[in-house]
């Protein structure tokens, strides 16, 4: 990772504030997995605009039975037309998981492409990838939580990234990846949450 980019990240991270994690009413130290998305946009031949797009923090471990777990998640088939045209991307599918672990509903919340084309072409490719991901997601099975604060919920929402990649190799840590974000759509049951 270039030194200038590391300095940019450090400068931003130094400004972050976190609420403490409490155990027995006292603040305790925790370790989490962290993911950071840095987006760079080329302005001219040697200048870029850089911003922190997203950060996520996930526990290193979760007590068994305290959250929704996957049971059967066969990946979707790569749409043939997309593969022939060199189209790749990530579909963020939001899934409504019922109490029996079946999928009650699924929506392509956002489709990000790894290629640039006309607005119309990108909209069409987002539809193709989104449809393939949602069709397969409706067949998936999950294991509902049986303990903890989520156990008695009527349903659970799960967000799953579905990658359509032509190459089986993912970018390594610190490598740039093309990213053309698509519009974010709400899902019908969001108002109930």
Residue positions per predicted region:
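Charge-biased low-complexity segments
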Residues: 1-193
């Amino acid at each position: 990772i270039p030194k200038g980019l590391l300095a940019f990240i450090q400068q931003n991270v130094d400004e972050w504030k976190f609420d403490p994690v409490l155990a027995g009413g006292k603040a305790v130290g925790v370790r989490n997995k962290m993911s950071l998305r840095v987006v760079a946009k080329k302005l001219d031949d040697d200048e870029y605009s850089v911003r922190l797009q997203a950060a996520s923090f996930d526990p290193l471990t979760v007590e068994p039975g305290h959250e929704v777990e996957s049971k059967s998640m066969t990946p979707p088939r790569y749409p043939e037309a997309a593969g022939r045209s060199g189209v790749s991307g990530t579909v963020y599918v939001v899934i409504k998981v019922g109490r029996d672990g079946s999928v009650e509903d699924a929506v392509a919340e956002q489709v990000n492409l790894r290629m640039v084309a006309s607005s119309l072409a990108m909209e069409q490719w987002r539809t193709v990838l989104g449809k393939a991901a949602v069709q397969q997601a409706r067949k998936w099975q999950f294991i509902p939580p049986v303990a903890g604060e989520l156990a008695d919920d009527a349903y659970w929402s799960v967000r799953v990234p579905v990658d359509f990649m032509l190459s089986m190799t993912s970018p390594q840590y610190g490598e740039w990846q093309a990213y053309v974000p698509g519009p974010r759509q709400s899902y019908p049951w969001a108002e109930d949450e």
